Swiss-Prot record:
This is Phosphoenolpyruvate carboxykinase [GTP]. GO terms for molecular function: GTP binding; manganese ion binding; phosphoenolpyruvate carboxykinase (GTP) activity. It comes from Corynebacterium glutamicum (strain ATCC 13032 / DSM 20300 / JCM 1318 / BCRC 11384 / CCUG 27702 / LMG 3730 / NBRC 12168 / NCIMB 10025 / NRRL B-2784 / 534). Pfam families: PEPCK_GTP (PF00821), PEPCK_N (PF17297). Substrate binds at R82, Y221, G222, G223, S272, N387, S388, R389.
Amino acid sequence: MTTAAIRGLQGEAPTKNKELLNWIADAVELFQPEAVVFVDGSQAEWDRMAEDLVEAGTLIKLNEEKRPNSYLARSNPSDVARVESRTFICSEKEEDAGPTNNWAPPQAMKDEMSKHYAGSMKGRTMYVVPFCMGPISDPDPKLGVQLTDSEYVVMSMRIMTRMGIEALDKIGANGSFVRCLHSVGAPLEPGQEDVAWPCNDTKYITQFPETKEIWSYGSGYGGNAILAKKCYALRIASVMAREEGWMAEHMLILKLINPEGKAYHIAAAFPSACGKTNLAMITPTIPGWTAQVVGDDIAWLKLREDGLYAVNPENGFFGVAPGTNYASNPIAMKTMEPGNTLFTNVALTDDGDIWWEGMDGDAPAHLIDWMGNDWTPESDENAAHPNSRYCVAIDQSPAAAPEFNDWEGVKIDAILFGGRRADTVPLVTQTYDWEHGTMVGALLASGQTAASAEAKVGTLRHDPMAMLPFIGYNAGEYLQNWIDMGNKGGDKMPSIFLVNWFRRGEDGRFLWPGFGDNSRVLKWVIDRIEGHVGADETVVGHTAKAEDLDLDGLDTPIEDVKEALTAPAEQWANDVEDNAEYLTFLGPRVPAEVHSQFDALKARISAAHA
Protein backbone atom coordinates (compact mmCIF):
# COMPACT_ATOMS: atom_id res chain seq x y z
CA MET A 1 0.00 0.00 0.00
CA THR A 2 1.51 3.31 -1.01
CA THR A 3 0.24 6.71 -0.03
CA ALA A 4 -0.21 7.54 -3.70
CA ALA A 5 -3.27 5.29 -3.57
CA ILE A 6 -4.99 7.88 -1.35
CA ARG A 7 -6.33 10.31 -3.92
CA GLY A 8 -5.98 13.95 -2.88
CA LEU A 9 -3.62 13.32 0.04
CA GLN A 10 -1.71 16.47 0.97
CA GLY A 11 1.93 15.45 1.51
CA GLU A 12 3.14 12.10 2.80
CA ALA A 13 0.98 10.04 5.16
CA PRO A 14 2.55 10.25 8.65
CA THR A 15 1.84 6.57 9.35
CA LYS A 16 2.84 3.14 8.06
CA ASN A 17 -0.33 1.48 9.38
CA LYS A 18 -1.60 -0.41 6.33
CA GLU A 19 -5.01 -1.10 7.87
CA LEU A 20 -5.49 2.62 8.48
CA LEU A 21 -4.21 3.63 5.04
CA ASN A 22 -6.39 1.08 3.25
CA TRP A 23 -9.44 2.24 5.20
CA ILE A 24 -8.75 5.88 4.31
CA ALA A 25 -8.24 4.99 0.63
CA ASP A 26 -11.58 3.15 0.56
CA ALA A 27 -13.29 6.08 2.27
CA VAL A 28 -11.86 8.51 -0.29
CA GLU A 29 -13.37 6.48 -3.12
CA LEU A 30 -16.75 6.57 -1.35
CA PHE A 31 -16.81 10.20 -0.14
CA GLN A 32 -14.83 11.71 -3.06
CA PRO A 33 -13.28 14.63 -1.16
CA GLU A 34 -11.22 17.25 -2.94
CA ALA A 35 -8.29 16.80 -0.53
CA VAL A 36 -7.20 14.56 2.36
CA VAL A 37 -5.35 15.99 5.37
CA PHE A 38 -3.91 14.21 8.42
CA VAL A 39 -4.36 16.59 11.37
CA ASP A 40 -1.43 17.04 13.77
CA GLY A 41 -3.30 18.55 16.73
CA SER A 42 -1.06 21.61 16.96
CA GLN A 43 -2.10 25.07 18.11
CA ALA A 44 -0.96 26.47 14.76
CA GLU A 45 -3.33 24.10 12.97
CA TRP A 46 -6.23 25.09 15.26
CA ASP A 47 -5.54 28.79 14.71
CA ARG A 48 -5.32 28.31 10.95
CA MET A 49 -8.64 26.43 10.87
CA ALA A 50 -10.27 29.09 13.02
CA GLU A 51 -9.13 31.81 10.60
CA ASP A 52 -10.50 29.85 7.65
CA LEU A 53 -13.85 29.33 9.39
CA VAL A 54 -14.10 33.03 10.28
CA GLU A 55 -13.57 33.82 6.61
CA ALA A 56 -16.22 31.25 5.66
CA GLY A 57 -18.73 32.75 8.11
CA THR A 58 -18.93 29.59 10.24
CA LEU A 59 -17.15 31.19 13.20
CA ILE A 60 -17.20 34.68 14.67
CA LYS A 61 -14.03 35.76 16.45
CA LEU A 62 -14.92 37.16 19.87
CA ASN A 63 -13.48 40.24 21.57
CA GLU A 64 -9.81 39.39 22.12
CA GLU A 65 -9.63 41.33 25.39
CA LYS A 66 -12.72 39.66 26.88
CA ARG A 67 -12.50 36.20 25.27
CA PRO A 68 -8.95 35.60 24.00
CA ASN A 69 -8.65 33.07 21.17
CA SER A 70 -12.38 32.25 21.45
CA TYR A 71 -15.03 31.84 18.78
CA LEU A 72 -18.79 31.64 18.34
CA ALA A 73 -20.47 29.21 15.94
CA ARG A 74 -24.13 29.37 14.94
CA SER A 75 -25.56 26.09 13.73
CA ASN A 76 -28.41 25.58 11.32
CA PRO A 77 -31.68 25.73 13.33
CA SER A 78 -32.38 22.14 12.26
CA ASP A 79 -29.08 20.94 13.77
CA VAL A 80 -29.05 21.90 17.44
CA ALA A 81 -29.00 18.72 19.55
CA ARG A 82 -28.53 14.96 19.65
CA VAL A 83 -31.21 13.22 17.57
CA GLU A 84 -32.15 10.07 19.46
CA SER A 85 -34.79 9.10 16.89
CA ARG A 86 -32.02 8.88 14.25
CA THR A 87 -29.52 7.08 16.50
CA PHE A 88 -29.13 3.35 15.87
CA ILE A 89 -27.41 0.36 17.45
CA CYS A 90 -26.89 -2.02 14.54
CA SER A 91 -26.04 -5.30 16.25
CA GLU A 92 -26.20 -8.51 14.24
CA LYS A 93 -29.27 -9.63 16.23
CA GLU A 94 -32.09 -7.24 17.09
CA GLU A 95 -32.44 -8.63 20.62
CA ASP A 96 -28.82 -7.67 21.34
CA ALA A 97 -29.74 -4.00 20.84
CA GLY A 98 -32.55 -4.45 23.33
CA PRO A 99 -35.73 -2.45 23.89
CA THR A 100 -34.06 0.90 24.65
CA ASN A 101 -32.33 1.34 21.27
CA ASN A 102 -33.36 1.84 17.66
CA TRP A 103 -32.14 -1.14 15.62
CA ALA A 104 -31.50 -1.88 11.96
CA PRO A 105 -29.65 -4.84 10.36
CA PRO A 106 -26.00 -3.78 10.07
CA GLN A 107 -25.46 -4.55 6.40
CA ALA A 108 -28.76 -2.97 5.38
CA MET A 109 -27.83 0.17 7.34
CA LYS A 110 -24.37 0.30 5.77
CA ASP A 111 -25.90 -0.08 2.31
CA GLU A 112 -28.39 2.71 3.03
CA MET A 113 -25.79 5.06 4.52
CA SER A 114 -23.30 4.34 1.74
CA LYS A 115 -25.84 5.76 -0.73
CA HIS A 116 -25.83 9.00 1.28
CA TYR A 117 -22.05 8.91 1.78
CA ALA A 118 -21.36 8.50 -1.96
CA GLY A 119 -19.83 11.77 -3.12
CA SER A 120 -20.92 13.57 0.06
CA MET A 121 -17.51 15.23 0.54
CA LYS A 122 -17.19 16.58 -3.01
CA GLY A 123 -15.58 20.00 -2.94
CA ARG A 124 -14.50 19.55 0.69
CA THR A 125 -11.44 18.36 2.58
CA MET A 126 -11.50 15.04 4.42
CA TYR A 127 -9.64 15.36 7.70
CA VAL A 128 -8.03 12.30 9.28
CA VAL A 129 -8.35 12.79 13.05
CA PRO A 130 -6.46 10.23 15.21
CA PHE A 131 -7.41 10.45 18.89
CA CYS A 132 -6.84 8.78 22.24
CA MET A 133 -9.55 8.18 24.84
CA GLY A 134 -8.15 9.09 28.25
CA PRO A 135 -4.57 10.00 29.09
CA ILE A 136 -2.09 9.48 26.25
CA SER A 137 0.30 7.89 28.79
CA ASP A 138 -1.95 4.81 29.13
CA PRO A 139 0.18 1.77 28.15
CA ASP A 140 -2.93 0.08 26.69
CA PRO A 141 -5.00 2.98 25.38
CA LYS A 142 -8.34 2.97 23.58
CA LEU A 143 -7.75 4.71 20.26
CA GLY A 144 -9.83 5.95 17.38
CA VAL A 145 -9.65 7.69 14.03
CA GLN A 146 -12.43 9.95 12.78
CA LEU A 147 -12.71 10.88 9.12
CA THR A 148 -14.70 14.10 8.83
CA ASP A 149 -15.40 16.94 6.42
CA SER A 150 -16.11 19.43 9.23
CA GLU A 151 -13.42 21.81 10.47
CA TYR A 152 -15.71 22.68 13.41
CA VAL A 153 -15.55 19.02 14.43
CA VAL A 154 -11.75 18.97 14.11
CA MET A 155 -11.48 22.06 16.32
CA SER A 156 -13.87 20.54 18.87
CA MET A 157 -12.01 17.22 18.87
CA ARG A 158 -8.76 19.02 19.70
CA ILE A 159 -10.40 20.33 22.88
CA MET A 160 -12.40 17.21 23.79
CA THR A 161 -9.75 14.51 23.13
CA ARG A 162 -5.99 13.93 23.07
CA MET A 163 -5.83 14.28 19.32
CA GLY A 164 -3.22 14.46 16.58
CA ILE A 165 0.26 13.14 15.97
CA GLU A 166 0.74 11.70 19.48
CA ALA A 167 -2.41 9.61 19.11
CA LEU A 168 -1.34 8.49 15.64
CA ASP A 169 2.01 7.41 17.08
CA LYS A 170 0.12 5.40 19.73
CA ILE A 171 -1.75 3.57 16.96
CA GLY A 172 1.61 2.82 15.34
CA ALA A 173 2.15 0.50 12.41
CA ASN A 174 -0.03 -2.32 13.71
CA GLY A 175 -2.33 -0.89 16.41
CA SER A 176 -6.10 -1.24 16.40
CA PHE A 177 -8.50 1.69 16.47
CA VAL A 178 -12.22 2.41 16.39
CA ARG A 179 -13.24 3.58 12.92
CA CYS A 180 -15.41 6.69 12.89
CA LEU A 181 -16.91 8.03 9.66
CA HIS A 182 -18.57 11.44 9.59
CA SER A 183 -19.91 13.64 6.83
CA VAL A 184 -22.16 16.67 7.15
CA GLY A 185 -23.76 15.55 3.90
CA ALA A 186 -23.32 18.80 1.98
CA PRO A 187 -21.22 18.24 -1.16
CA LEU A 188 -20.11 21.29 -3.13
CA GLU A 189 -20.25 21.36 -6.90
CA PRO A 190 -17.59 23.44 -8.75
CA GLY A 191 -18.34 27.11 -8.20
CA GLN A 192 -21.10 26.43 -5.66
CA GLU A 193 -21.02 28.80 -2.69
CA ASP A 194 -20.82 27.14 0.73
CA VAL A 195 -23.16 27.89 3.64
CA ALA A 196 -22.00 28.90 7.12
CA TRP A 197 -23.22 25.66 8.73
CA PRO A 198 -23.37 22.77 6.25
CA CYS A 199 -25.65 19.88 7.25
CA ASN A 200 -28.37 17.70 5.76
CA ASP A 201 -32.04 17.21 6.65
CA THR A 202 -31.42 13.44 6.60
CA LYS A 203 -29.44 12.34 9.65
CA TYR A 204 -28.01 9.05 10.87
CA ILE A 205 -25.90 8.39 13.98
CA THR A 206 -25.10 4.70 13.86
CA GLN A 207 -23.04 2.38 16.03
CA PHE A 208 -21.97 -1.13 14.98
CA PRO A 209 -21.12 -2.93 18.25
CA GLU A 210 -19.62 -6.13 16.83
CA THR A 211 -17.18 -4.34 14.53
CA LYS A 212 -16.70 -1.29 16.82
CA GLU A 213 -17.53 1.19 14.06
CA ILE A 214 -19.36 4.53 14.17
CA TRP A 215 -21.00 6.04 11.09
CA SER A 216 -22.55 9.51 11.27
CA TYR A 217 -24.21 11.52 8.50
CA GLY A 218 -26.04 14.80 8.11
CA SER A 219 -25.26 16.62 11.36
CA GLY A 220 -22.36 18.88 12.31
CA TYR A 221 -23.47 19.31 15.90
CA GLY A 222 -22.11 18.07 19.22
CA GLY A 223 -22.53 14.43 20.07
CA ASN A 224 -23.83 13.65 16.57
CA ALA A 225 -20.56 14.73 15.00
CA ILE A 226 -17.86 14.75 17.72
CA LEU A 227 -17.81 10.96 17.61
CA ALA A 228 -15.35 10.48 20.47
CA LYS A 229 -17.99 11.75 22.86
CA LYS A 230 -21.23 9.80 23.38
CA CYS A 231 -20.81 7.51 20.35
CA TYR A 232 -17.41 6.11 21.36
CA ALA A 233 -16.99 7.00 25.05
CA LEU A 234 -20.36 5.48 25.99
CA ARG A 235 -22.13 3.49 23.25
CA ILE A 236 -19.13 1.63 21.80
CA ALA A 237 -17.13 1.72 25.05
CA SER A 238 -20.03 0.16 26.99
CA VAL A 239 -19.84 -2.81 24.60
CA MET A 240 -16.06 -3.03 25.05
CA ALA A 241 -16.53 -2.77 28.81
CA ARG A 242 -18.95 -5.70 28.94
CA GLU A 243 -16.61 -7.82 26.81
CA GLU A 244 -13.49 -6.89 28.80
CA GLY A 245 -14.89 -6.69 32.34
CA TRP A 246 -15.10 -2.97 33.10
CA MET A 247 -17.74 -0.21 32.98
CA ALA A 248 -18.33 2.83 30.75
CA GLU A 249 -20.72 5.17 32.55
CA HIS A 250 -22.42 8.54 32.13
CA MET A 251 -20.87 9.85 35.35
CA LEU A 252 -18.97 12.83 36.68
CA ILE A 253 -15.82 12.19 38.74
CA LEU A 254 -15.29 14.51 41.71
CA LYS A 255 -12.37 14.78 44.12
CA LEU A 256 -13.40 16.01 47.58
CA ILE A 257 -10.77 17.04 50.14
CA ASN A 258 -11.59 17.36 53.84
CA PRO A 259 -10.01 19.92 56.22
CA GLU A 260 -7.36 17.37 57.22
CA GLY A 261 -6.25 17.05 53.59
CA LYS A 262 -7.67 13.57 53.00
CA ALA A 263 -9.06 13.12 49.49
CA TYR A 264 -12.15 11.14 48.53
CA HIS A 265 -13.43 10.43 45.03
CA ILE A 266 -17.08 10.29 44.05
CA ALA A 267 -18.66 9.22 40.76
CA ALA A 268 -22.21 10.37 40.09
CA ALA A 269 -24.85 9.66 37.45
CA PHE A 270 -27.68 12.13 36.83
CA PRO A 271 -30.12 12.40 33.91
CA SER A 272 -30.07 15.65 31.96
CA ALA A 273 -31.17 18.83 33.79
CA CYS A 274 -30.38 17.35 37.20
CA GLY A 275 -27.26 19.34 38.09
CA LYS A 276 -24.46 17.02 37.01
CA THR A 277 -22.02 19.65 35.72
CA ASN A 278 -22.70 21.91 38.71
CA LEU A 279 -21.87 19.03 41.08
CA ALA A 280 -18.74 18.09 39.10
CA MET A 281 -17.46 21.65 39.56
CA ILE A 282 -18.91 22.26 43.04
CA THR A 283 -17.50 24.96 45.32
CA PRO A 284 -18.20 23.61 48.84
CA THR A 285 -19.89 25.96 51.29
CA ILE A 286 -18.52 24.09 54.32
CA PRO A 287 -15.36 25.76 55.69
CA GLY A 288 -12.18 23.77 55.10
CA TRP A 289 -13.60 21.49 52.41
CA THR A 290 -12.40 21.84 48.82
CA ALA A 291 -13.29 20.09 45.57
CA GLN A 292 -11.56 19.35 42.30
CA VAL A 293 -12.96 18.04 39.04
CA VAL A 294 -11.64 14.91 37.33
CA GLY A 295 -14.50 14.76 34.83
CA ASP A 296 -17.95 16.24 34.31
CA ASP A 297 -19.64 13.71 32.03
CA ILE A 298 -18.12 10.26 31.45
CA ALA A 299 -16.27 7.74 33.62
CA TRP A 300 -14.54 4.51 32.64
CA LEU A 301 -14.38 2.29 35.73
CA LYS A 302 -12.01 -0.65 36.15
CA LEU A 303 -11.32 -3.00 39.03
CA ARG A 304 -7.84 -3.00 40.55
CA GLU A 305 -6.52 -4.91 43.55
CA ASP A 306 -7.85 -2.50 46.15
CA GLY A 307 -11.04 -1.19 44.53
CA LEU A 308 -12.84 0.40 41.62
CA TYR A 309 -10.88 3.08 39.75
CA ALA A 310 -12.26 5.75 37.40
CA VAL A 311 -10.69 7.54 34.45
CA ASN A 312 -12.20 10.40 32.48
CA PRO A 313 -11.81 9.46 28.79
CA GLU A 314 -12.34 13.08 27.73
CA ASN A 315 -10.02 16.07 27.66
CA GLY A 316 -12.56 18.90 27.75
CA PHE A 317 -15.93 20.17 28.94
CA PHE A 318 -18.82 20.36 26.47
CA GLY A 319 -21.27 22.08 28.77
CA VAL A 320 -24.77 23.48 28.43
CA ALA A 321 -24.41 27.27 28.64
CA PRO A 322 -27.83 28.62 29.76
CA GLY A 323 -28.13 28.80 33.54
CA THR A 324 -24.36 28.78 34.02
CA ASN A 325 -23.22 31.76 36.10
CA TYR A 326 -20.88 32.77 38.92
CA ALA A 327 -23.44 31.70 41.53
CA SER A 328 -24.52 28.33 40.09
CA ASN A 329 -21.13 27.27 38.72
CA PRO A 330 -18.25 29.69 39.35
CA ILE A 331 -15.68 27.08 38.31
CA ALA A 332 -17.18 26.75 34.81
CA MET A 333 -17.20 30.52 34.42
CA LYS A 334 -13.59 30.81 35.61
CA THR A 335 -12.56 27.99 33.26
CA MET A 336 -13.74 30.09 30.32
CA GLU A 337 -12.05 33.31 31.51
CA PRO A 338 -8.61 32.62 29.93
CA GLY A 339 -10.34 32.11 26.57
CA ASN A 340 -9.51 29.27 24.16
CA THR A 341 -13.21 28.41 24.14
CA LEU A 342 -15.53 27.39 21.31
CA PHE A 343 -19.10 28.59 21.89
CA THR A 344 -22.06 27.32 19.89
CA ASN A 345 -25.53 28.91 19.60
CA VAL A 346 -25.10 31.47 22.39
CA ALA A 347 -25.91 35.16 21.89
CA LEU A 348 -23.41 37.81 20.79
CA THR A 349 -23.11 41.18 22.55
CA ASP A 350 -22.45 44.44 20.74
CA ASP A 351 -18.89 44.50 22.06
CA GLY A 352 -18.04 41.02 20.82
CA ASP A 353 -18.67 39.05 24.01
CA ILE A 354 -21.13 36.20 24.57
CA TRP A 355 -24.35 36.01 26.60
CA TRP A 356 -26.99 33.47 27.51
CA GLU A 357 -30.09 33.22 29.67
CA GLY A 358 -29.19 32.85 33.34
CA MET A 359 -25.85 34.64 33.04
CA ASP A 360 -24.98 37.07 35.83
CA GLY A 361 -26.55 40.52 35.70
CA ASP A 362 -29.31 41.95 33.56
CA ALA A 363 -29.69 41.09 29.91
CA PRO A 364 -27.98 43.61 27.61
CA ALA A 365 -30.20 46.15 25.86
CA HIS A 366 -29.28 44.64 22.50
CA LEU A 367 -27.87 41.31 21.32
CA ILE A 368 -27.57 39.24 18.18
CA ASP A 369 -29.37 36.00 19.00
CA TRP A 370 -28.22 32.47 18.16
CA MET A 371 -29.94 32.65 14.76
CA GLY A 372 -28.23 35.92 13.83
CA ASN A 373 -31.22 38.18 14.49
CA ASP A 374 -31.47 41.36 16.54
CA TRP A 375 -32.65 40.70 20.09
CA THR A 376 -33.77 42.93 22.96
CA PRO A 377 -35.15 42.05 26.41
CA GLU A 378 -38.63 42.58 24.91
CA SER A 379 -38.10 39.79 22.36
CA ASP A 380 -40.30 36.71 22.67
CA GLU A 381 -37.57 34.17 21.85
CA ASN A 382 -34.51 33.18 23.88
CA ALA A 383 -31.30 34.89 22.82
CA ALA A 384 -29.30 31.68 23.29
CA HIS A 385 -30.57 28.24 22.28
CA PRO A 386 -31.53 26.14 25.35
CA ASN A 387 -28.93 23.55 24.27
CA SER A 388 -26.22 26.10 23.44
CA ARG A 389 -22.74 25.01 24.49
CA TYR A 390 -19.26 25.97 25.60
CA CYS A 391 -16.32 23.73 24.69
CA VAL A 392 -13.14 24.25 26.71
CA ALA A 393 -10.16 22.14 27.87
CA ILE A 394 -10.25 20.67 31.38
CA ASP A 395 -6.68 21.69 32.18
CA GLN A 396 -7.77 25.33 31.94
CA SER A 397 -10.05 24.86 34.96
CA PRO A 398 -8.78 26.35 38.25
CA ALA A 399 -10.29 23.29 39.95
CA ALA A 400 -8.88 20.61 37.63
CA ALA A 401 -7.62 17.64 39.64
CA PRO A 402 -4.08 16.72 38.56
CA GLU A 403 -5.21 13.07 38.51
CA PHE A 404 -7.34 13.73 35.42
CA ASN A 405 -4.15 13.04 33.45
CA ASP A 406 -3.33 9.83 35.38
CA TRP A 407 -4.11 6.78 33.24
CA GLU A 408 -4.56 4.60 36.33
CA GLY A 409 -7.41 6.81 37.48
CA VAL A 410 -8.72 7.56 40.96
CA LYS A 411 -10.15 5.09 43.46
CA ILE A 412 -13.89 5.64 43.82
CA ASP A 413 -15.22 5.82 47.39
CA ALA A 414 -18.90 6.38 46.55
CA ILE A 415 -21.27 6.30 43.59
CA LEU A 416 -24.28 8.62 43.55
CA PHE A 417 -27.47 8.26 41.54
CA GLY A 418 -29.89 11.17 41.39
CA GLY A 419 -32.97 12.25 39.49
CA ARG A 420 -35.31 15.22 39.69
CA ARG A 421 -38.19 14.25 42.00
CA ALA A 422 -40.55 16.75 43.65
CA ASP A 423 -41.57 14.10 46.18
CA THR A 424 -40.94 10.44 47.15
CA VAL A 425 -37.11 10.29 47.02
CA PRO A 426 -35.23 11.64 50.07
CA LEU A 427 -32.32 14.07 49.94
CA VAL A 428 -29.71 11.36 50.54
CA THR A 429 -29.85 7.62 51.21
CA GLN A 430 -27.19 4.90 51.32
CA THR A 431 -28.23 1.67 49.64
CA TYR A 432 -27.79 -1.63 51.49
CA ASP A 433 -25.21 -3.13 49.15
CA TRP A 434 -24.07 -3.26 45.51
CA GLU A 435 -27.05 -5.32 44.30
CA HIS A 436 -29.53 -3.02 46.02
CA GLY A 437 -27.69 -0.02 44.55
CA THR A 438 -27.84 -1.57 41.08
CA MET A 439 -31.63 -1.92 41.37
CA VAL A 440 -31.92 1.69 42.57
CA GLY A 441 -29.85 2.85 39.59
CA ALA A 442 -31.88 0.71 37.20
CA LEU A 443 -35.06 2.45 38.33
CA LEU A 444 -33.59 5.97 38.29
CA ALA A 445 -36.23 8.39 37.03
CA SER A 446 -37.21 12.03 36.94
CA GLY A 447 -40.75 13.30 37.45
CA GLN A 448 -42.22 15.12 34.47
CA THR A 449 -43.03 18.80 34.90
CA ALA A 450 -45.30 21.15 32.99
CA ALA A 451 -42.22 22.19 31.01
CA SER A 452 -42.27 18.83 29.22
CA ALA A 453 -44.71 19.52 26.40
CA GLU A 454 -45.38 15.90 25.46
CA ALA A 455 -45.37 14.48 28.97
CA LYS A 456 -48.16 13.82 31.40
CA VAL A 457 -47.30 15.81 34.51
CA GLY A 458 -46.38 13.54 37.39
CA THR A 459 -45.39 10.54 35.29
CA LEU A 460 -41.86 9.21 35.55
CA ARG A 461 -39.27 9.46 32.80
CA HIS A 462 -37.07 6.44 33.37
CA ASP A 463 -33.35 6.69 32.73
CA PRO A 464 -31.44 3.69 34.12
CA MET A 465 -28.07 4.83 35.50
CA ALA A 466 -28.67 8.01 33.40
CA MET A 467 -27.53 5.84 30.47
CA LEU A 468 -30.81 5.41 28.56
CA PRO A 469 -29.64 7.04 25.27
CA PHE A 470 -26.11 5.65 25.59
CA ILE A 471 -26.26 1.91 26.37
CA GLY A 472 -24.68 0.33 23.30
CA TYR A 473 -26.34 -3.07 23.74
CA ASN A 474 -29.22 -4.80 25.55
CA ALA A 475 -30.12 -2.88 28.73
CA GLY A 476 -30.76 -6.11 30.65
CA GLU A 477 -27.23 -7.29 29.87
CA TYR A 478 -25.93 -3.85 30.84
CA LEU A 479 -27.49 -4.34 34.29
CA GLN A 480 -25.97 -7.84 34.37
CA ASN A 481 -22.56 -6.24 33.86
CA TRP A 482 -23.19 -4.17 36.99
CA ILE A 483 -24.06 -7.32 38.94
CA ASP A 484 -21.00 -9.13 37.55
CA MET A 485 -18.70 -6.25 38.52
CA GLY A 486 -20.11 -6.31 42.04
CA ASN A 487 -19.54 -10.05 42.29
CA LYS A 488 -15.94 -9.66 41.13
CA GLY A 489 -15.18 -6.68 43.36
CA GLY A 490 -16.97 -7.89 46.48
CA ASP A 491 -16.36 -5.69 49.50
CA LYS A 492 -13.87 -3.58 47.52
CA MET A 493 -16.74 -1.94 45.62
CA PRO A 494 -17.77 1.60 46.58
CA SER A 495 -20.99 2.32 48.44
CA ILE A 496 -23.92 3.45 46.30
CA PHE A 497 -26.10 6.39 47.35
CA LEU A 498 -29.35 7.87 46.04
CA VAL A 499 -29.69 11.67 46.17
CA ASN A 500 -32.42 14.14 45.24
CA TRP A 501 -31.69 17.87 45.30
CA PHE A 502 -35.18 18.71 44.01
CA ARG A 503 -37.69 17.84 46.77
CA ARG A 504 -40.47 20.41 47.04
CA GLY A 505 -42.80 21.39 49.84
CA GLU A 506 -46.58 21.38 49.51
CA ASP A 507 -46.42 25.01 48.40
CA GLY A 508 -44.06 24.09 45.55
CA ARG A 509 -40.89 25.64 46.96
CA PHE A 510 -37.60 23.72 46.95
CA LEU A 511 -36.81 22.27 50.38
CA TRP A 512 -33.05 22.17 49.80
CA PRO A 513 -30.88 25.03 48.45
CA GLY A 514 -28.67 22.82 46.26
CA PHE A 515 -25.60 24.05 44.35
CA GLY A 516 -22.62 24.59 46.70
CA ASP A 517 -24.66 23.47 49.69
CA ASN A 518 -24.80 19.98 48.19
CA SER A 519 -21.32 19.69 49.73
CA ARG A 520 -23.17 19.17 53.03
CA VAL A 521 -24.72 16.03 51.57
CA LEU A 522 -21.33 14.91 50.21
CA LYS A 523 -19.85 15.36 53.70
CA TRP A 524 -22.56 13.07 55.10
CA VAL A 525 -21.73 10.52 52.38
CA ILE A 526 -18.08 10.61 53.52
CA ASP A 527 -19.09 10.43 57.20
CA ARG A 528 -21.25 7.42 56.39
CA ILE A 529 -18.40 5.65 54.55
CA GLU A 530 -16.10 6.32 57.52
CA GLY A 531 -18.72 5.03 59.99
CA HIS A 532 -19.04 8.36 61.79
CA VAL A 533 -22.84 8.70 61.57
CA GLY A 534 -25.93 6.54 61.80
CA ALA A 535 -29.04 6.69 59.63
CA ASP A 536 -32.80 6.25 59.65
CA GLU A 537 -34.11 3.05 58.10
CA THR A 538 -36.60 3.91 55.35
CA VAL A 539 -38.15 1.84 52.58
CA VAL A 540 -35.32 2.84 50.24
CA GLY A 541 -32.30 2.31 52.53
CA HIS A 542 -30.20 4.11 55.15
CA THR A 543 -31.48 7.69 54.96
CA ALA A 544 -29.64 10.59 56.60
CA LYS A 545 -30.89 12.20 59.81
CA ALA A 546 -31.11 15.99 59.72
CA GLU A 547 -28.98 16.31 62.86
CA ASP A 548 -26.15 14.39 61.17
CA LEU A 549 -25.90 16.88 58.29
CA ASP A 550 -23.52 19.81 58.74
CA LEU A 551 -26.02 22.69 58.53
CA ASP A 552 -23.86 25.43 60.08
CA GLY A 553 -24.45 28.71 58.29
CA LEU A 554 -27.37 27.35 56.26
CA ASP A 555 -30.43 29.61 56.03
CA THR A 556 -32.81 26.76 55.21
CA PRO A 557 -35.24 25.97 58.07
CA ILE A 558 -34.51 22.65 59.80
CA GLU A 559 -38.15 21.64 59.18
CA ASP A 560 -37.53 21.85 55.43
CA VAL A 561 -34.42 19.69 55.72
CA LYS A 562 -36.32 17.11 57.76
CA GLU A 563 -39.12 17.04 55.19
CA ALA A 564 -36.57 16.64 52.37
CA LEU A 565 -35.23 13.56 54.19
CA THR A 566 -38.58 11.74 54.38
CA ALA A 567 -39.36 8.71 52.21
CA PRO A 568 -43.17 8.48 52.44
CA ALA A 569 -44.23 4.87 51.96
CA GLU A 570 -47.49 5.89 50.28
CA GLN A 571 -45.54 7.84 47.65
CA TRP A 572 -43.20 4.91 47.08
CA ALA A 573 -46.29 2.71 46.73
CA ASN A 574 -47.50 5.01 43.94
CA ASP A 575 -44.31 4.25 41.99
CA VAL A 576 -44.47 0.46 42.31
CA GLU A 577 -46.68 -0.24 39.30
CA ASP A 578 -44.74 2.15 37.06
CA ASN A 579 -41.41 0.63 38.13
CA ALA A 580 -42.68 -2.93 37.67
CA GLU A 581 -43.83 -2.07 34.14
CA TYR A 582 -40.44 -0.57 33.36
CA LEU A 583 -38.55 -3.67 34.49
CA THR A 584 -40.88 -5.72 32.28
CA PHE A 585 -40.19 -3.34 29.38
CA LEU A 586 -36.42 -3.84 29.84
CA GLY A 587 -37.02 -7.48 29.01
CA PRO A 588 -35.99 -11.01 29.96
CA ARG A 589 -32.27 -10.26 30.26
CA VAL A 590 -32.73 -8.11 33.40
CA PRO A 591 -30.76 -9.98 36.11
CA ALA A 592 -32.63 -12.05 38.68
CA GLU A 593 -30.80 -10.07 41.37
CA VAL A 594 -32.48 -6.84 40.22
CA HIS A 595 -35.90 -8.50 40.32
CA SER A 596 -35.29 -9.91 43.80
CA GLN A 597 -34.13 -6.50 45.05
CA PHE A 598 -37.29 -4.94 43.61
CA ASP A 599 -39.39 -7.61 45.34
CA ALA A 600 -37.66 -6.75 48.62
CA LEU A 601 -38.39 -3.05 48.05
CA LYS A 602 -42.06 -3.84 47.43
CA ALA A 603 -42.17 -5.87 50.65
CA ARG A 604 -40.68 -2.97 52.64
CA ILE A 605 -43.20 -0.57 51.11
CA SER A 606 -46.10 -2.91 51.92
CA ALA A 607 -44.92 -3.35 55.51
CA ALA A 608 -44.51 0.41 56.02
CA HIS A 609 -47.76 1.19 54.25
CA ALA A 610 -49.81 -1.35 56.19
